UniProtKB/Swiss-Prot annotation:
Chain ranges passing through the membrane: 39-59
Organism of provenance: Rotavirus B (isolate RVB/Rat/United States/IDIR/1984/G1P[X]) (RV-B)
Chief place of localization: host cell
Protein name (record): Non-structural protein 1, peptide 1
Family classification: Belongs to the rotavirus B NSP1-1 family.
Bilayer topology annotation: Single-pass membrane protein
GO cellular component: host cell membrane; membrane
Domain of life according to the entry: Viruses
Keywords: Host membrane, Membrane, Transmembrane, Transmembrane helix
Localisation: Host membrane
Length: 115
C-alpha cells in the first residue's frame, strides 16, 4: 500500500464588522465582491443580448425594405412603365407657354416629327 496524502485547504475570509446607531452589521467582503461582479456580468450580458436582438430586427427590416423597393422600382415595375408609355394618352401633349422662343419651337417640331 502506498502513502496517502491528504491536504486540507483553509479559506480565510475577511469579515467586516461595523456598528451604526447600536446596530451591528457583519458583511463578508468576498460575498459583496461576488455580488458586484455578478451584477456587472448580468448587465453586460443583457446589453449584448439587447444589441444582438436589435441587429437581427434591423437586418429583417432592411431585407423587407430592400425587397419592397426592388418591387416598386425594379424589374417588375419596368413592364408596368412600358405598358403605360405604349398606350397613347390624350393628355400627353402640353402646349408651351412661350411659343415665340425658337428653342421651344425646334424641340416641339423634333418631338412631333419623331412620333
Amino acid at each position: 500500500m502506498g502513502n496517502r496524502q491528504s491536504s486540507a485547504q483553509l479559506n480565510s475570509h475577511l469579515t467586516q464588522i461595523s456598528s451604526q446607531h447600536s446596530n451591528l452589521y457583519i458583511s463578508d467582503s468576498k460575498t459583496s465582491t461576488f455580488q458586484t461582479q455578478h451584477i456587472i456580468l448580468v448587465a453586460g450580458v443583457g446589453i449584448i443580448v439587447a444589441l444582438f436582438i436589435l441587429l437581427v430586427c434591423s437586418c429583417v427590416l432592411n431585407c423587407y425594405l430592400c425587397n419592397k423597393f426592388k418591387r416598386e422600382n425594379g424589374i417588375q415595375s419596368i413592364s408596368k412603365r412600358s405598358l403605360r408609355q405604349s398606350r397613347p394618352s390624350p393628355n400627353l401633349y402640353v402646349q408651351p407657354v412661350m411659343q415665340s422662343n425658337p428653342f421651344i419651337k425646334e424641340a416641339r417640331e423634333s418631338i412631333c416629327s419623331e412620333v
